[in-house]
Curated annotation (Swiss-Prot):
Species in which this protein is naturally found: Homo sapiens
Interaction with LGB: annotated segments: 1-59
Protein name: Protein LMBR1L
Residue segments, region LCN1-binding: 1-76
Lineage: Eukaryota, Metazoa, Chordata, Craniata, Vertebrata
Cytoplasmic side: 43-66, 136-154, 218-305, 372-388, 453-489
Tissue note: Expressed in testis, pituitary gland, adrenal gland, trachea, placenta, thymus, cerebellum, stomach, mammary gland, spinal cord. A weaker expression is detected in colon, pancreas, and prostate.
Known function: Plays an essential role in lymphocyte development by negatively regulating the canonical Wnt signaling pathway. In association with UBAC2 and E3 ubiquitin-protein ligase AMFR, promotes the ubiquitin-mediated degradation of CTNNB1 and Wnt receptors FZD6 and LRP6. LMBR1L stabilizes the beta-catenin destruction complex that is required for regulating CTNNB1 levels. Acts as a LCN1 receptor and can mediate its endocytosis.
Listed transmembrane segments: 22-42, 67-87, 115-135, 155-175, 197-217, 306-326, 351-371, 389-409, 432-452
Key word Transport present: no
Family (UniProt): Belongs to the LIMR family.
């Protein structure tokens, strides 16, 4: 064999080993996420749905739970996708020729983006509808009962739903795109219609993030205040403990002497209220035993960090709005190449990259808090060991929509300069200047409005409490009308 043949063979072997290495790394990453999500979901599922007398229902719920675990793992991978890419780029810049990080390259990052895009499509369009129809199915009338009968019914329902969605996407694309070939042909399903459908879903996710993130940024202050121990100047734990003990004693007296009240009592409701008060009293005892460092330093530092992160997010978006008006390069776009480690995506270098990662995670947590705080989705909020299977499916779908839109959301707001890889950069609406500009302006305006409203309401409540106006008796709404009637008489 000649020397050129050896060179060709060595290049092929190297490409083969790199491909195998990427597959192993991707599999290990997904397995880790899958195990974490499975542990997380088992803490919220209803144990009664998996230990029923009917083995068929238990089997169906177990299969649906595995599909939900897969979907939630993909959602978590979508959240980690952009931060992992930014950190990888900075690591390659700092250690360009290190032997121990040869596995970290542009091909691996690009492959992870493509896998997340593929499995997000698969979960949203096929797996989650299959899981929902599978849990609700009973088999066709006249067919034999069993899991296989449910599978047949679910597959038929899924095929009908696929045809319906495909027809709607075809009509929508024909209306938006005036190209006659797209109206007459359905052959380019994988190349055009499926990415177009995911583009619509991603756009809905970005709009959902636009609504939920400002609300979550405002709610983060109150949520953090409930989790941390406030200074004694801001809360009186002794008074709360006294009130809790007094209410518990009153409810216990009602339970022990039900004949003392002439109204019928709901004993089950009273027992639940007593248990809730006992749990609240235990939490208050723990908060009272907190150290002075936790009480006087932890809460102010946490509030200061939240205020800095929120203000920094609004400032970056405001700067990005000005850049959109001046420079066309500020528009979000896709990156087809896989070369990383060439240039930093932050003007501040590694420090700026760390700030970008922290802001991305902060906005994602805020969007989840805002999502579950909104009145429309509050009923979806999972409960510890008391969440139905259909509710778990709904939560997984919503979290996947939010997380898969996070890279587009971050790049649209200018939180990072890292361009979108793979099919994430092929969305049609990303090139529309008016959509991107209005989106940035709406985010900055809504976030500022929510923060101003939250802080003014908090300051107003503290002033009312400080002046003792909260102890004043409130006027009865019907009293003035009654006085007028007596005057006329």
């Amino acid at each position: 064999m000649e020397a050129p043949d050896y060179e060709v063979l060595s290049v092929r072997e190297q490409l083969f080993h790199e491909r195998i290495r990427e597959c192993i790394i991707s599999t290990l990453l997904f397995a880790t996420l899958y195990i974490l999500c499975h542990i997380f979901l088992t803490r919220f599922k209803k144990p009664a749905e998996f230990t029923t007398v009917d083995d068929e229902d238990a089997t169906v719920n177990k299969i649906a739970l595995e599909l939900c675990t897969f979907t939630l793992a993909i959602a978590l991978g979508a959240v980690l996708l952009l931060p992992f890419s930014i950190i990888s780029n900075e690591v390659l810049l700092s250690l360009p020729r290190n032997y121990y990080i040869q596995w970290l390259n542009g091909s691996l990052i690009h492959g992870l983006w493509n896998l997340v895009f593929l499995f997000s499509n698969l979960s949203l369009i096929f797996l989650m509808p299959f899981a929902y129809f599978f849990t609700e199915s009973e088999g066709f009338a006249g067919s034999r009962k069993g899991v296989l009968g449910r599978v047949y019914e679910t597959v038929v329902m899924l095929m009908l739903l696929t045809l319906l969605v495909l027809g709607m996407v075809w009509v929508a694309s024909a209306i938006v795109d005036k190209n006659k070939a797209n109206r007459e042909s359905l052959y380019d399903f994988w190349e055009y219609y499926l990415p177009y459908l995911y583009s619509c879903i991603s756009f809905l996710g970005v709009l959902l993030l636009l609504v939920c993130t400002p609300l979550g940024l405002a709610r983060m202050f109150s949520v953090t205040g409930k989790l941390l121990v406030k200074p004694r100047l801001l809360e009186d734990l002794e008074e709360q403990l006294y009130c809790s003990a007094f209410e518990e004693a009153a409810l216990t007296r009602r339970i022990c002497n039900p004949t003392s009240c002439w109204l019928p009592l709901d004993m089950e409701l009273l027992h639940r209220q007593v248990l809730a008060l006992q749990t609240q009293r235990v939490l208050l005892e723990k908060r009272r035993k907190a150290s002075a460092w936790q009480r006087n330093l932890g809460y102010p530092l946490a509030m200061l960090c939240l205020l800095v992160l929120t203000g920094l997010s609004v400032l970056i978006v405001a700067i990005h709005i000005l850049e959109l008006l001046i420079d066309e390069a500020a528009m979000p776009r896709g990156m087809q190449g896989t070369s990383l480690g060439q240039v930093s995506f932050s003007k501040l270098g590694s420090f700026g990259a760390v700030i970008q990662v922290v802001l991305i995670f902060y906005l994602m947590v805020s969007s989840v808090v805002g999502f579950y705080s909104s009145p429309l989705f509050r009923s979806l909020r999972p409960r510890w060991h008391d969440t139905a299977m259909t509710q778990i499916i709904g939560n997984c779908v919503c979290l996947l929509v939010l997380s898969s839109a996070l890279p587009v959301f971050s790049r649209t707001l200018g939180l990072t300069r890292f361009d979108l890889l793979g099919d994430f950069g092929r969305f049609n609406w990303l090139g529309n200047f008016y959509i991107v500009f209005l989106y940035n302006a709406a985010f900055a305006g809504l976030t500022t409005l929510c923060l101003v409203k939250t802080f003014t309401a908090a300051v107003r409540a503290e002033l009312i409490r400080a002046f003792g106006l909260d102890r004043l008796p409130l006027p009865v709404s019907g009293f003035p009308q009654a006085s007028r009637k007596t005057q006329h008489q």
